[in-house]
UniProtKB/Swiss-Prot annotation:
UniProt-recorded Gene Ontology molecular function terms: mRNA binding; structural constituent of ribosome
HAMAP family found in the cross-reference section: Ribosomal_uL13
Similarity-based family: Belongs to the universal ribosomal protein uL13 family.
Protein species of origin: Lactobacillus johnsonii (strain CNCM I-12250 / La1 / NCC 533)
Cited NCBIfam families: rplM_bact
Gene name per UniProt: rplM
KW Ribonucleoprotein (keyword) present: yes
Keyword Cytoplasm belongs to the record: no
Keywords: Ribonucleoprotein, Ribosomal protein
Function, in words: This protein is one of the early assembly proteins of the 50S ribosomal subunit, although it is not seen to bind rRNA by itself. It is important during the early stages of 50S assembly.
Lineage: superkingdom: Bacteria
Subunit structure: Part of the 50S ribosomal subunit.
One of the protein's GO biological processes: negative regulation of translation
Name of the protein in its database record: Large ribosomal subunit protein uL13
Length: 147
């Protein structure tokens, strides 16, 4: 009986992808990015091995929030001091720090362990169109083809 071949970290060839977030909803962008970071788009996907690729997200400031998420979706953080709970609506976070909004959204879709942290570190988000990874020769990905 043949067994399923499992991927090894040394056998994986990683690619670099650029995704343009202009006029794309936050959830659709995040699910596509999380899937690529996990390696679920590859035939040799193995859940306990980091098989994913690198992702560069550009124009994060131009993504859109659908419905009433700009006012109703709240992101919380705590300073570890009494009364230190801070709440920021998604619309305000998009205006002030769109990179953080995309990072929080994608991070919530990855595993909460060391493997998820390794996968998260392969994502690079930029608010504008310029990025500093031209030397890696990233391929452009159309988000509409992934969904």
């Amino acid at each position: 009986m043949r067994t399923t071949p499992l991927a090894k970290t040394s056998d994986i060839k990683r690619k670099w992808y650029v995704i343009d977030a202009t006029d794309v909803s936050l959830g659709r962008l995040s699910t596509a990015v999380a899937s690529i970071l996990r390696g679920k788009n590859k035939p040799q996907y193995t859940p306990n091995v980091d098989t994913g690729d690198y992702v560069i997200v550009v124009n994060a400031a131009k993504l859109k929030l659908t419905g009433k998420k700009a006012t109703d979706k709240i992101y919380y953080r705590h300073s570890d001091y009494r009364g230190g709970l801070r709440a920021t609506p998604a619309g305000e976070l998009l205006a002030k720090n769109p990179v953080r909004l995309v990072e929080l959204s994608v991070k919530g879709m990855l595993p909460k362990n060391t493997l998820g942290h390794q996968e998260f570190m392969k994502m690079h988000v930029y608010a504008g169109e310029d990025h500093e990874h031209a030397a890696q020769k990233p391929e452009k990905l159309d988000i509409n083809e992934l969904i």
